[in-house]
């Protein structure tokens, strides 16, 4: 690390090449978005959540998932996403299947929605109860189960669209609040650079999610990951801009250019930011290894966002700050 700190950091001068890396990823993600789109979960396009609650954990989860995915398909429903596993607060474990808002491969029309919901909560629920009992008997399982262990929750298309709209509004308000905070604590240039960095991090995460969309459903867990990413990104930005402000107040940098100040801030914030991200990634890996699938769905977007946030904080935000400073100086000179 000491050898690294002795090297010259000319990150600002390399800004065009560095931003090109991000633009390539974003452009590739855009191609996937236009082609296949995001893998929207039932939270945002409607559907149903079917929970099977058991006392003990299933030994062969793959066989269990395959069996009931096939059973639900035979009943006329399409299973989306992987089976989710989560512990119950009162003891036991829940296995959740997510069904698309369709029947026999066709979308449910408005006039047929009531029939769709009624069938799920009656005939399908009864058939599923019998199938669970039959499956446990066929594998000689002593796992306890009763008919109250089946829960079905339907999310309509209208409510899912309303949720999607509220999500976008909440994220927009959060970005505005962050911009105001950074502008008050630092400068307008710092605030604008931070917002550009946050937009970069979200775009990279969404782009990579589109590229790996088959494995990453976009649901409330994904939105929670985006909010977490914004938090980490703004923290890294504050570290950089705090160092820049410190340099601007120091007489040692009285005659230094904005580029020199930015490069110095990057160099002397590098270790702090990398150690912060590294410790977070260690915890993320631990969650992957020891957590249930509900949490694991949250992990990959977080990794994308952490890497994007580190890249933007060190390689993009300071350069964008320099750019906005130049624009500000030109505007002032024109007014004068």
Model-derived features: positions:
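A structural signal for conserved, well-ordered secondary-structure elements
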Residues: 1-336
């Amino acid at each position: 690390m000491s050898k690294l700190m002795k090297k010259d950091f000319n990150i600002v001068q390399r800004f065009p090449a560095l931003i090109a890396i991000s633009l390539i990823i974003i452009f590739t993600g855009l191609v996937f978005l236009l082609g296949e789109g995001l893998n929207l979960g039932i939270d945002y396009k409607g559907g149903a959540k079917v929970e099977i609650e058991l006392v003990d954990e299933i030994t062969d989860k793959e066989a269990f998932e395959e069996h009931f995915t096939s059973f639900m398909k035979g009943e006329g429903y399409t299973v989306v996403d992987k089976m989710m596993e989560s512990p119950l607060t009162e003891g036991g474990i829940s296995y959740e299947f997510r069904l698309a808002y369709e029947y026999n491969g066709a979308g449910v029309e408005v006039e047929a929605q009531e029939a769709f919901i009624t069938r799920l909560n009656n005939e399908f629920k009864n058939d599923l109860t019998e199938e669970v009992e039959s499956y446990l008997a066929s594998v000689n399982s002593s796992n306890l189960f009763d008919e109250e262990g089946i829960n079905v929750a339907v999310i309509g298309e209208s409510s899912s669209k309303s949720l999607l709209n509220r999500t976008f509004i909440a994220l927009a308000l959060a970005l505005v609040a962050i911009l105001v905070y950074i502008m008050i604590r630092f400068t307008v240039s710092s605030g604008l650079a931070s917002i550009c960095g946050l937009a970069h991090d979200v775009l990279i995460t969404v782009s990579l999610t589109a590229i790996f969309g088959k494995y990453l459903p976009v649901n409330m867990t994904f939105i929670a990951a985006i909010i977490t990413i914004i938090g980490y990104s703004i923290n890294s930005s504050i570290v950089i801009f705090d160092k820049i402000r410190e340099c601007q107040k120091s007489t040692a940098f009285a005659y230094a250019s904005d580029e020199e100040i930015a490069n110095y801030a990057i160099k002397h914030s590098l270790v702090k930011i990398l150690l912060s991200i590294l410790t977070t990634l260690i915890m993320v890996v631990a969650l992957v290894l020891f957590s249930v699938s509900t949490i694991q769905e949250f992990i990959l977007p977080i990794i994308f966002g952490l890497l994007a946030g580190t890249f933007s904080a060190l390689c993009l935000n300071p350069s964008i700050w320099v750019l906005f400073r130049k624009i500000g100086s030109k505007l002032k000179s024109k007014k004068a």
